[in-house]
């Protein structure tokens, strides 16, 4: 199953999503492709991703790909990650991220070759596209839905799954991340404070489980 967290704003995000979906559909023989919005007053990426994994359980899917609406992996590493995910770890179908300009998205095809020449800001990442069994996702605690905005939720989840499951598995390849105007770069201070709880518990299973168990209501 392919689960995509998404809330539109009537602008550029819809155009990016349309092209992203076109490309993602051709990457794998998906049984289900769905968009998820937890319907919190402020779009909650963590909760929306968790809803996608809940749906995968309901559908009886053995593996779920949770992919952001502006992100596109390459076909070969995606297939490799899906077929390897039964090891109970978190998999990433890429080893580097290429930022791609939204105004050139029409030039992308299934090979993603345009991103190799137009992509900028190449960097490693452990977010954007996760591949896992639903069981592994929940054994790592799922994403903390108290972290509402972009950025700290990935880092908190990283600390949790590395502590509770082990290091992630990265499959050689590129993730194209489409840059768009409403994609913020400033972390919310309240989100950062929650993220730091996970970072302080990193490497200590008992402490990490306590952090997860102590989660309060969504703000």
State each model region's role.
Residues 35-39, 75:
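Ligand-binding pocket scaffold of soluble enzyme catalytic domains
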Residues 47-63:
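Active-site nucleotide-sugar/metal-binding loop of Leloir-type enzymes
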Residues 146-219:
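C-terminal catalytic/acceptor-binding lobe
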Residues 61-72:
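Short beta-strand-to-loop acidic/aromatic patch adjacent to the donor-nucleotide binding site
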Residues 74-146:
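Conserved catalytic core of nucleotide-sugar-dependent glycosyltransferases
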């Amino acid at each position: 199953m392919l689960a995509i967290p998404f809330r539109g704003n009537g602008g550029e995000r819809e155009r990016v999503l349309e092209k992203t979906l076109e490309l993602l559909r051709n990457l794998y023989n998906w049984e289900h492709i769905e968009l998820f919005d937890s319907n919190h007053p402020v779009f909650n990426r963590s909760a929306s991703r968790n809803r996608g994994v809940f749906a995968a359980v309901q559908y009886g899917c053995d593996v779920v790909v949770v992919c952001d609406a502006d992100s596109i992996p390459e076909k070969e590493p995606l297939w490799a990650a899906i077929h390897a995910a039964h090891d109970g770890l978190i998999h990433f179908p890429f080893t580097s991220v290429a930022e791609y300009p939204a105004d050139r998205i029409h030039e992308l095809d299934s090979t993603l070759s345009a991103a190799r020449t137009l992509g900028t800001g190449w960097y490693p990442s452990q977010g954007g596209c996760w591949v896992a069994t639903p069981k592994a996702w929940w054994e790592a605690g799922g994403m903390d839905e108290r972290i509402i905005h972009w950025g700290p939720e990935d880092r908190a989840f990283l600390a949790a799954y590395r502590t509770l499951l082990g290091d992630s598995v990265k499959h050689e390849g590129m993730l194209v991340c489409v840059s768009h105007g409403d994609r913020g770069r400033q972390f919310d201070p309240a989100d950062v404070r929650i993220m730091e709880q996970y970072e302080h518990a990193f490497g200590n299973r008992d402490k990490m489980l306590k952090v997860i168990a102590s989660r309060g209501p969504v703000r």
